């Protein structure tokens, strides 16, 4: 059986190192002796059930580690289930019982170090490049044994669409990019050209060939196929590493781009500059024959540069972008790849790109900023020195990315330990069940305190285009090293709320100087318009987004301000100012004032706000109303709050819930779920948004109806069912936060119980 291990490094591994003794680290290991016959049967039933129901619920319920933890905690649900017949008859006691059931279940899932584990995956282009990299370097069988490969194959099979292709994410229609990547992944994992479950390979290959073959794969795919030797570098758009040599004042300099754009281009430019091609093995030669419609040697690669499958085209290239690529391809690249510029300029640029790669690797303990970047940087390090320590340090951190669930083994974005824990702690605090949850809060508090970044990036970090990170929290764990504004704000809120509770119950409060560092970080990420960015200050002009080379994602080139980040920061700063009124008083007050103006300015005509990190308008409206309420705005005094409430009330479903399709994100307009369905997590967000705006005092009936849905949807053990994915990034791709289905319904019930029953208010 597979077992989740926590907070462990290998003391004998000189290539593995940590800033806080691996607190929050999650790795999976296969133990052939683990589990009773009954436990193994339960795992197999979870796998079978997912496969049977995958057309209805595309995301896994993340059951394997939950089974493990519940057994280790000897969890048994002793609080009877609650069912509500009529929303008007809902009582404080009903809400309390349901809340206690959910909190007791969720508390049993807390890790020993205080965080809540959980999957953060969903995109179907994460795993294949890792397999490609290890295949090229000759480490595939060393890193992944038979059990690993069995679970990887399970994951690929589980998410193949009926038409034979794979989507951008598990809920998406098939696209060329992910279909090609997953087909090659299957072949490298040992499946034959007509092999795989239910003729998986044959069906996928037919999907590809019916749409013109792999020459129609989008830009990122063309790069990976060129690396593998299934495509030719001359058919890709140029990514000259010489861009690193440009002066930083140039508008398109990588120093100015969004950190994720910069971190992808960094190793890609190195690979492009090297024109690296992996070993041309018999399998690669077979793939050339299988995936092209004409002989490989007869393909006109220059013509294929602009070929893209229509299924992949979310962000078509503007004319100006194609003109730039053509200029670089026709005039610039021939100069840079021939003497003397190949020696004078190209080699210097490659060395500088590698310098940046090593710097980012070291500062993230070889986790890197995310899984896409991780694989590219690891491959670049191997090319630079196949037997070097840099590559070996990368290999040591691969387990940090792997996750196993009933739908198999997948590669995660990187981890959401801190993000999930910050919300979980706030939900449990809101439950007012401290007599039952003191130990849980104490462990969560301890995890948050140990996970704060305590220093800035090493050396002259500004020359490496990095921002301050001291005082921040990451999305995952401290070793990751990348500051995020909303993760920092939510963690800061936790620390401040816990500081108001007895130390003997929740542990000692955080040192004020560390809180000051967090505030300093948050203030540094506010723009002139009052909005708050996610990772770094805005450095690029908005028009640079026209240069986005990735056809299936958007908002990729320039950092920008986000409603959710701004709201989280407002809430954290307001609470901080209440507890530390003499620290940077004027600066913080002005920051809050400007942030509120930003939130008001970002509201849509229908009263909603657009969400960048969750689906979508409901998510951002919850955040925005919370930020406005924290700053003292009310339904009576704020038109923005009144309009936000109107949006939520007019989108409530007949069953009392809310349900928004992920299509709202790419379409940038509110689209309800098909079939008038509700989603419990989105329902929870709407409840909390309405409570922020004082709905309980005006008319609690909409809240009662929504609470009834949540309570009646609770499962026998206190869990909640997995439904549609509600996380998103880069406007067009979903991200599955598996703990959300517990955290937010519990949090909403907690806030509802406090707000909707006047006679029980303290």
Curated annotation (Swiss-Prot):
Gene3D superfamilies: 1.50.10.20. Keywords: Isomerase, Isoprene biosynthesis, Repeat. GO terms for biological process: triterpenoid biosynthetic process. GO terms for molecular function: beta-amyrin synthase activity. It comes from the Eukaryota. Component of the oleanane-type triterpene saponins biosynthetic pathway. Oxidosqualene cyclase converting oxidosqualene into beta-amyrin, generating five rings and eight asymmetric centers in a single transformation. This is Beta-amyrin synthase 1. It comes from Barbarea vulgaris. The gene is LUP5.
């Amino acid at each position: 059986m597979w077992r989740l291990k926590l907070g462990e490094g290998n003391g004998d591994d000189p290539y593995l190192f940590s800033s806080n003794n691996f607190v929050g680290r999650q790795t999976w290991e296969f133990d052939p002796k683990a589990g009773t016959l009954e436990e193994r049967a339960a795992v197999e039933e979870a796998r079978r059930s997912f496969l049977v129901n995958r057309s209805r619920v595309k995301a896994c319920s993340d059951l394997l580690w939950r089974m493990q933890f519940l057994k280790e905690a000897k969890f048994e649900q002793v609080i009877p289930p609650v069912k509500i017949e009529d929303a008007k008859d809902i009582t404080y006691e009903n809400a309390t019982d349901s809340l206690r059931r959910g909190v007791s279940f969720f508390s049993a899932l807390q890790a020993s170090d205080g965080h809540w584990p959980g999957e953060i995956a969903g995109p179907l282009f994460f795993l294949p490049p890792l397999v490609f990299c290890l295949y090229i370097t000759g480490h595939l069988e060393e890193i992944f044994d038979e059990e690993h490969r069995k679970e990887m194959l399970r994951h690929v099979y589980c998410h193949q669409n009926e038409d034979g292709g794979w989507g951008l994410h598990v809920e998406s229609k098939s696209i060329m990019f992910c279909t090609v990547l997953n087909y090659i992944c299957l072949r490298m994992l040992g499946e034959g050209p007509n092999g795989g479950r239910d003729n998986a390979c044959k069906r996928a290959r037919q999907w590809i060939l019916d749409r013109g073959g792999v020459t129609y794969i989008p830009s990122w795919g063309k790069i990976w196929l060129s690396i593998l030797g299934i495509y030719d570098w001359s058919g890709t758009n140029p990514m000259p590493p010489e861009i690193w040599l440009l002066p930083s004042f140039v508008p398109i300099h990588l120093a100015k781009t969004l950190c994720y754009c910069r971190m992808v281009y960094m190793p890609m430019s190195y690979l492009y500059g090297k024109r690296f091609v992996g070993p041309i093995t018999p399998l690669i030669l077979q793939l050339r024959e299988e995936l092209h419609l004409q002989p490989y040697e007869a393909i006109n690669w220059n013509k294929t540069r602009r070929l893209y499958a229509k299924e992949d085209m979310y962000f078509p290239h503007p004319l100006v972008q194609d003109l730039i690529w053509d200029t670089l391809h026709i005039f610039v690249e021939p100069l840079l790849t021939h003497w003397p510029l190949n020696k004078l300029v190209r080699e210097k640029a490659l060395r500088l790109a590698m310098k940046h790669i090593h710097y980012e690797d070291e500062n993230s303990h070889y986790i890197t900023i995310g899984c896409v970047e991780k694989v590219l940087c690891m491959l670049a390090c191997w090319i630079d020195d196949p037997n070097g320590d840099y590559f070996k340090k990368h290999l040591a951190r691969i387990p940090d990315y792997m996750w196993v669930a009933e739908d198999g083994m997948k590669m995660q974005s990187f981890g959401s330990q801190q993000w999930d824990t910050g919300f979980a702690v706030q939900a449990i605090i809101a439950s007012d069940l401290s007599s039952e949850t003191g130990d849980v809060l104490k462990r969560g508090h301890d995890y948050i305190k140990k996970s704060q970044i305590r220093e800035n990036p090493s050396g002259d970090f500004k020359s490496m285009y990095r921002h301050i990170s001291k005082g921040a929290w990451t999305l995952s764990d401290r070793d990751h090293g990348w500051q995020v504004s909303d993760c920092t704000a939510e963690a800061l809120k936790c620390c401040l709320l816990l500081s108001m509770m007895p130390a003997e119950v929740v542990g000692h409060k955080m040192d004020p100087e560390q809180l000051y560092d967090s505030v300093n970080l948050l203030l540094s990420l506010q723009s002139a318009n009052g909005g708050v960015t996610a990772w770094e200050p805005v450095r690029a002009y908005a028009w640079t987004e026209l240069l986005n080379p990735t056809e299936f994602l958007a908002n990729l080139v320039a950092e920008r301000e986000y409603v959710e980040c701004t709201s989280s920061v407002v809430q954290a700063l307001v609470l901080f100012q209440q507890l530390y009124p003499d620290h940077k008083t004027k600066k913080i007050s002005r920051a809050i004032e400007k942030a509120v103006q930003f939130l008001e300015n970002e509201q849509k005509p229908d009263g909603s706000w657009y969400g960048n990190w969750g689906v979508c308008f409901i998510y951002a409206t919850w955040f925005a109303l919370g930020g406005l309420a924290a700053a003292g705005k009310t339904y009576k005094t704020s038109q923005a709050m009144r309009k936000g409430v109107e949006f939520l009330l007019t989108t409530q479903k007949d069953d009392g819930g809310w349900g928004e399709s992920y299509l709202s994100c790419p379409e940038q307009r509110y689209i309800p779920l098909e079939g008038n369905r509700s989603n419990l997590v989105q329902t929870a967000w709407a409840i909390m948004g309405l409570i922020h705006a004082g709905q309980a005092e005006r008319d609690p009936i909409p809240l009662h109806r929504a609470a009834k849905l949540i309570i009646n949807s609770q499962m026998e053990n206190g869990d909640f069912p997995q439904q549609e994915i509600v996380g998103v990034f880069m406007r067009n791709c979903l991200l599955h936060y598996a703990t959300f289905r517990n955290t937010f319904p519990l949090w909403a019930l907690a806030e509802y119980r406090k707000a909707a029953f006047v006679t029980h208010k303290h």
